[in-house]
Amino acid sequence: MSKALIKFIRLSPTKARLIAREVQGMNAELAMASLKFMPNKGAKYIANAISSAVANGGFEANEVIVKSCRVDAAAVLKRFRPRARGSASRIRKPTSHILVEVAKAEVKAEEKKTVAKKAPAAKKTTTTKAPAKKTTSTKKATAKKES
């Protein structure tokens, strides 16, 4: 397993996380190819981090998968913009850290497992209920008893 960390990217972490979720669990070569055609600014940085992580481990891009791609918030640059009547409003320019971990793809040996089949369920028979007897109201029943 190898890692790559790119720090202080001038990109909002929330925007970068949208792209980071897309590549988790993908083959590194496939992830870099799909990021190449994304129009987002963060796609370029994440693709760069993936290729750096692959190179750090000494792997080939087709033999590793992206185990995790994490985007953390970094320092926020604060600027001021002049506004009306001598006031100013604050502008926040967020930055982020991108951490990518790649691991060698595990080739799973297919094991044949015999699964016991369930016995087919018995057919359900529909039964119709006999109509319920009509009950007389309590006032009428007490009047009949008295007479």
Swiss-Prot record:
Key words of the record: Ribonucleoprotein, Ribosomal protein, RNA-binding, rRNA-binding
Start and end residues of each stretch annotated as Disordered: 110-147
GO annotation, biological process: translation
Assigned GO CC terms: cytosolic large ribosomal subunit
GO molecular function terms attached to this record: rRNA binding; structural constituent of ribosome
InterPro entries in the record: Ribosomal_uL22, Ribosomal_uL22_bac/chlpt-type, Ribosomal_uL22_bac/org-type, Ribosomal_uL22_CS, Ribosomal_uL22_sf
Biased composition (Low complexity): 117-140
Function: This protein binds specifically to 23S rRNA; its binding is stimulated by other ribosomal proteins, e.g. L4, L17, and L20. It is important during the early stages of 50S assembly. It makes multiple contacts with different domains of the 23S rRNA in the assembled 50S subunit and ribosome.
Subunit-level organization: Part of the 50S ribosomal subunit.
Similarity-based family: Belongs to the universal ribosomal protein uL22 family.
Annotated protein name in UniProt: Large ribosomal subunit protein uL22
